[in-house]
Amino acid sequence: MDKEYVGFAALPNQLHRKSVKKGFDFTLMVAGESGLGKSTLINSLFLTNLYEDRQIPEASARLTQTLTIERRGVEIEEGGIKVKLTVVDTPGFGDSVDCSDCWLPVVRFIEEQFEQYLRDESGLNRKNIQDSRVHCCLYFISPFGRGLRPLDVAFLRAVHEKVNIIPVIGKADALMPKETQALKQKIREQLKEEEINIYQFPECDSDEDEDFKRQDAEMKESIPFAVVGSCEVVRDGGPRPVRGRHYSWGTVEVENPHHCDFLNLRRMLVQTHLQDLKEVTHDLLYEGYRARCLQSLARPGARDRASRSKLSRQSATEIPLPMLPLADTEKLIREKDEELRRMQEMLEKMQAQMQLSQAQGEQSDAL
């Protein structure tokens, strides 16, 4: 006798429809010194223009410019799939003469997103929690140096336990192929020597197809990604126009894997590992932050220290303890009390109607 069909095989279709209807969100941070092509690469990756209204300051103004945090959002739809992309930019990073502690606003911003999510998650109304946590940080490294600079090391040390780091060599068309490989090897050695954790690719399952395993191996070998960005379409005598940069010695094609790692970076960010970046952010980075917060609250005198650190904010490495203001807490309690009172009144009315209907039914039976 054949086994009867129950219908559990349709569960993936249910999840797919629900996910497509809800849409996806992804927050990407870009950091690194100015002039490395960060804005151009973002526009190239997502085929959009996020920075059309940006005003570039004069060189003299950059000497005293302080780092700011800018958020830009765009909704991208492709094949019926909607993605709400938020790009967090850090203009002014490393531009001033004195770069001491210039990474602290970035650390503070990342922790504030964790703090806000923990507040929302710990609140009474958790139906529509907005996830503004940073899921990935593209850190741009100059192609003109000999590896990581002291500023690069200091920044990466400060954030490597708070966000998924993907190192990127900007404007890689300034390097010869041998120079690119030498710089990549130097950066990998420095990251290992400084014990800086970057995003680790998950191991492929044994049942994955060979093409996926090959692409995954190529992406792992490409780190740090040497990239070139361009939104211009150029012709180089080929059968079709390509996006790239035209020089006197030839043309650099953005989407040519022999010229740069742009395709591997886009494949990793969008096609293969976007969901894993979000899961690592939630399951490892955010849970680590949450555990540290709870441990701090459990220690004697933690609330007094929390209130003092909240006022001072002297160090961005201090763990902010997410406590709702008293007025907000009382307001939420009053709202829930009112909601419970209304539900109790509705229940009493329903019980009264049921008793009345029952009494009327008994009278009808007696007649």
Curated annotation (Swiss-Prot):
Keyword Phosphoprotein: yes
Gene Ontology terms: cellular component: cell division site; centrosome; microtubule cytoskeleton; midbody; septin complex; septin ring; synaptic vesicle
CDD domains: CDC_Septin
Sites bearing Phosphothreonine, chain numbering: T251
Any GO MF annotation of the entry: GTP binding
SUPFAM superfamilies registered for this protein in UniProt: P-loop containing nucleoside triphosphate hydrolases
Record domain Septin-type G: where: 22-296
Disulphide bond pairs: none
Modification Phosphoserine occurs at: S206, S248, S307, S315
Chain residue ranges for the region called G1 motif: 32-39
GO biological process: cytoskeleton-dependent cytokinesis; protein localization; regulation of exocytosis
Keywords: Cell cycle, Cell division, Cytoplasm, Cytoskeleton, GTP-binding, Nucleotide-binding, Phosphoprotein
Cell location: Cytoplasm; Cytoplasm, Cytoskeleton; Cytoplasm, Cytoskeleton, Microtubule organizing center, Centrosome; Midbody
Function text: Filament-forming cytoskeletal GTPase. May play a role in cytokinesis (Potential).
Assembly, per entry: Septins polymerize into heterooligomeric protein complexes that form filaments, and can associate with cellular membranes, actin filaments and microtubules. GTPase activity is required for filament formation. Interacts with AURKB.
Listed PANTHER family: SEPTIN
Stated family: Belongs to the TRAFAC class TrmE-Era-EngA-EngB-Septin-like GTPase superfamily. Septin GTPase family.
Protein name in UniProt: Septin-1
Annotated source species: Bos taurus
